[in-house]
Amino acid sequence: MTARAIIIGAPRSGSGKTSVTIGILRALTRRGLKVRGAKSGPDYIDPGFHTAATGLSGVNLDSWAMPPSLLNALAAQQADDTDFVILESAMGLFDGIPAAPGRTGSAADLARLYGLPVLLVLDVSGQSTTAAAVAKGFATYDPDVRMAGVVLNRLGSERHRKLSGDAIEAIGLPVVGAILRDPTLNLPERHLGLVQAGEYDDLMAHLDRLADMAEKSLDLDAVMRLATPLAPAAGGFADALQPPGQRIALAEDGAFTFLYPHVAAYWRKAGAEIVPFSPLADEAPDDSCDVCWLPGGYPELHAGKLAAAETFKAGMARFAATKPIHGECGGFMVLGEALEDASGETHRMLGLLGHATSFAKRKMNLGYREARLRADCPLGAQGALIRGHEFHYAQMTATGNDEPLADLADGLGNPIGASGYRRGHVSGTFFHAIARASA
């Protein structure tokens, strides 16, 4: 069975795409359909909500970071034995980076590649008939990206709905949803985006409220009729990040949460065993594992507890003496000597690398990254080219004396310089690895 699919797009972030996407996913799941979510680009938070809403794994589909073969393989995997795939756009529908055609990282790339229709979510607060001009611009901007319908979001009244909706339908686009303003439907955010799905005490209740909204305010049958088959060309996993070991000790708790779903899924698919442990519960990596991986997350919110986790710290030092450890972003921060939290208090970290970081001295670092490894590490062999994404506010306050791990370029190929560190069996970077670049 091959799924039918539709892209949920918008002019910008904050238009309501995520709430509409989750509402549709949860509502269709409650109807007994097999539905999966996907997210364009490198945002690793939204797939967690997609998974919670459906009970089936979400995935990122990133046309810049993933070579076409891997992109097709992951898209086909989402479509297999599934009724519908709802693909949520990052940012605005056409937003990406200047790159080769089809490799910009935008959701529009996926619409062209797979011939998928777009359901356009318009935040019409502060406007009415002007929304039709916006919709017409989207409908005519790129003839290879087809707008199939519109959802009006944040309406103030029935009159507001009629003015906006009639103008849009007059240009030939069906309006399949009209959502009144309701701040209680908003998902809470913090500095790296939405608060993660696993942090909600009443997550399912909120997802069901979004599903109730979708049932009430959207014509879900019409949305399903707009979807078209998702049938990617043949793909493969040669460019996936290979398992760094047969048994992988993976830090997994409220401080360590940012691991791309497709990365862990492929490790398992390739035969590796993932053995989770919780640094916040003062657990050490299992000594029987071959490698330890500290993913990103929010260690700055738990720095005091991590600093006091003596079993964790001793176990990591013991592991590092003979086996590889790699940290990404938040994990990289914990591998260093010290971490200053937002209040200015400094906490001792693992000291397996010599750098120190601060969350009190904040500056956003954001963008695609391409890294050529200077040495063998859990990311790959020396000389390997890895594509990923960097998004953090922490700043380096001390660099230490460790060797650089990689030479970094931004998404446009502009050199950024040496990045990350390595010492003995330990390595770390601020960027999150997504895939290997094609040879």
UniProtKB/Swiss-Prot annotation:
One of its GO terms (biological process) is cobalamin biosynthetic process. Keywords: ATP-binding, Cobalamin biosynthesis, Glutamine amidotransferase, Ligase, Magnesium, Nucleotide-binding. InterPro entries: CbiA/CobB_synth, Class_I_gatase-like, CobQ/CobB/MinD/ParA_Nub-bd_dom, GATase_3, P-loop_NTPase. It catalyses: hydrogenobyrinate + 2 L-glutamine + 2 ATP + 2 H2O = hydrogenobyrinate a,c-diamide + 2 L-glutamate + 2 ADP + 2 phosphate + 2 H(+). The active site is at residue 329. The keyword Phosphoprotein does not apply. Residues 247-439 form the GATase cobBQ-type domain. Its cofactor is Mg(2+). Pathway: Cofactor biosynthesis; adenosylcobalamin biosynthesis; cob(II)yrinate a,c-diamide from precorrin-2 (aerobic route): step 9/10. It is an enzyme of class 6 (ligase). The record marks 432 as: Increases nucleophilicity of active site Cys. GO terms for molecular function: ATP binding; cobyrinic acid a,c-diamide synthase activity; hydrogenobyrinic acid a,c-diamide synthase (glutamine-hydrolysing) activity. Its EC number is 6.3.5.9. SUPFAM superfamilies: Class I glutamine amidotransferase-like, P-loop containing nucleoside triphosphate hydrolases. Comprises of two domains. The C-terminal domain contains the binding site for glutamine and catalyzes the hydrolysis of this substrate to glutamate and ammonia. The N-terminal domain is anticipated to bind ATP and hydrogenobyrinate and catalyzes the ultimate synthesis of the diamide product. The ammonia produced via the glutaminase domain is probably translocated to the adjacent domain via a molecular tunnel, where it reacts with an activated intermediate. Catalyzes the ATP-dependent amidation of the two carboxylate groups at positions a and c of hydrogenobyrinate, using either L-glutamine or ammonia as the nitrogen source. The a and c carboxylates of hydrogenobyrinate are activated for nucleophilic attack via formation of a phosphorylated intermediate by ATP. CobB catalyzes first the amidation of the c-carboxylate, and then that of the a-carboxylate. Belongs to the CobB/CbiA family. This is Hydrogenobyrinate a,c-diamide synthase. The gene is cobB.
